[in-house]
Amino acid sequence: MPGTMETLRFQLLPPEPDDTFWGAPCEQPLERRYQALPALVCIMCCLFGVVYCFFGYRCFKAVLFLTGLLFGSVVIFLLCYRERVLETQLSAGASAGIALGIGLLCGLVAMLVRSVGLFLVGLLLGLLLAAAALLGSAPYYQPGSVWGPLGLLLGGGLLCALLTLRWPRPLTTLATAVTGAALIATAADYFAELLLLGRYVVERLRAAPVPPLCWRSWALLALWPLLSLMGVLVQWRVTTERDSHTEVVISRQRRRVQLMRIRQQEERKEKRRKKRPPRAPPRGPRAPPRPGPPDPAYRRRPVPIKRFNGDVLSPSYIQSFRDRQTGSSLSSFMASPTDTDYEYGSRGPLTACSGPPVRV
């Protein structure tokens, strides 16, 4: 474990200060000799920290990819740089190249498999909170062995990982805010104290005795929770108010379930059709099929019937016709053979009398 922790101080870190520097860091002025590669890495960490801290949940896929890339790269670099690979001791550049390639694969897996990405995000949150607890308890507690910090890191990481799988939205927001604030504080620590606070964290994880921190280090350490709180508030009130990646996943799952049900229903219908016995062909000549009714859309309308005045009988004519049939008004019919009291212009009977002609 001490050898693994020593690999954290590779080429990005400046030379380790001596005991006199640890003894009086506030009185002795710092020699700020910046290098190009560490400065570039710290600037990129600051930019990614801003994205993590204030836009973490909105950039959900990007956060999962970067978290997987970070875990894969760090773990593989420590293994390759510390251990012998194929009986060959790899250099720092070769180890960094291998770690970057495997880290890209881990990032893709974390981005595509949502549960893996959430587990890594929660694990990172637990590790950072455990490291913050070690830093905060520095004036009051000194671990006797390395197993105390190691158990705290593993326990906190697994607990936060499981809680993130249970409540993804609030804990992802908290994890991204804390991670982004830690990246910004690390970049500020490099430009202010040449990663003196980072070395202090490593020594605390190794359970090594270290002197108390200077006020500059405590100010940089106080920047971490302050930025974390700001990031949580900004994401809760602004950037994550209308976004919910959980609802998107649930809607996709419902759509898949509906498609599966439709396919199952179609398969059942096909099985029922196959189970039905085929109908026997009818004996004898088959009659030609009857033509079906024409389509109502193409049916011709009937020709409208024209009406004239003589087509409608007057009520007086109908009454006189009834009287003639019963024989009750024979004299009146002979006196006035035509009915002039008409309404629609009928001037004569439309039909002849059914009885024999009467002679007068």
Curated annotation (Swiss-Prot):
Ligase in keyword set: no
Pfam families: TM7S3_TM198
Biased composition (Pro residues): 279-296
Membrane topology: Multi-pass membrane protein
GO cellular component: cytoplasmic vesicle; plasma membrane
Compositional bias of kind Polar residues: 326-339
InterPro entries: TM7S3/TM198-like_dom, TMEM198
Keywords, comma-separated and alphabetical: Cell membrane, Cytoplasmic vesicle, Developmental protein, Membrane, Transmembrane, Transmembrane helix, Wnt signaling pathway
Domain of life: Eukaryota
GO biological process: positive regulation of canonical Wnt signaling pathway; Wnt signaling pathway
Chain segments carrying region Disordered: 260-302, 316-360
Leader peptide range in chain numbering: none
Presence of keyword Ribosomal protein: no
Localization per Swiss-Prot or TrEMBL: Membrane; Cell membrane; Cytoplasmic vesicle
Residue stretches spanning the membrane: 36-56, 59-79, 93-113, 116-136, 145-165, 177-197, 218-238
Purpose: Promotes LRP6 phosphorylation by casein kinases and thereby plays a role in Wnt signaling. May be a membrane scaffold protein involved in the self-aggregation of LRP6 to further enhance its activity.
Assigned protein family: Belongs to the TMEM198 family.
Quaternary assembly: Interacts with LRP6.
Name of the protein in its database record: Transmembrane protein 198
Originating species: Mus musculus
